[in-house]
Amino acid sequence: MLSKYLDRIDFSSYEDFKKNYKVKTPGDFNFGFDIVDGWAEEKGDNRALLWCDDDGNEKCFTFADMKRLSAKAANFFSEKGLKKGDVAMLILRRRWEYWVAAVGLMKLGVTFIPGTLQLTKKDITYRANAAGVSAIVCVDDEYVISQVEESKPDMPGV
C-alpha cells in the first residue's frame, strides 16, 4: 500500500526525509476508497481504530469494519441528498461515529467541518453560512440540538 503513494519509506536522517519525502496521489484520489478501503482489501482484519472514552469504554474497529460502516454512512448521506462538492458540519463530540461519518463523507467527495460541542447558535450560523454548509450531523445532546435547531432559520442552505 505505501509504495503506491510513496517513492521511499526509509530515510537515513531528518534532512534526507525533508529533501526526499514525496507523496504521489492520482488526480482522482479519495482517502475513503484509496486508503481505508485499500487497507481493508489488503489487511481487513487489522485494527484501524481503537476508540475509548473517559469511562473506560472501548470499541475496536478493523479496516473491514471501517470499509463496511463508512459505505453505509456514505449511502445514508447520499440518500439524504449530499453529493460531491457539498459541505457538511460534524458536531459529534469525541465519538467513534465521527470517524465513520468522516470517511463516509470523504467517499462521497463531501467536505466536512468538525465542530466542538461548545458552538452557540451564533457560531453555528456563522460557520454554516460562511462555508456553504448544506447539512449538519450532530450528537444527540440537548444543548447541541437546541443550538442547531435555533440556527436553522438563519441558515438557508442547510
Where are the regions a protein language model picked out?
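Short, solvent-exposed loop/helix junctions and linker helices
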Residues: 26-30, 60, 118
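A generic structural signal for short, solvent-exposed coil/turn residues
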Residues: 3, 15, 41-43, 55, ...
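A short N-terminal helical cap/helix-turn-helix that marks the beginning
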Residues: 1-8, 27-49, 68
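Conserved AMP-binding/adenylate-forming core of the ANL superfamily
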Residues: 45, 49-103, 120-125
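Short, contiguous pre-domain boundary segments
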Residues: 12-22
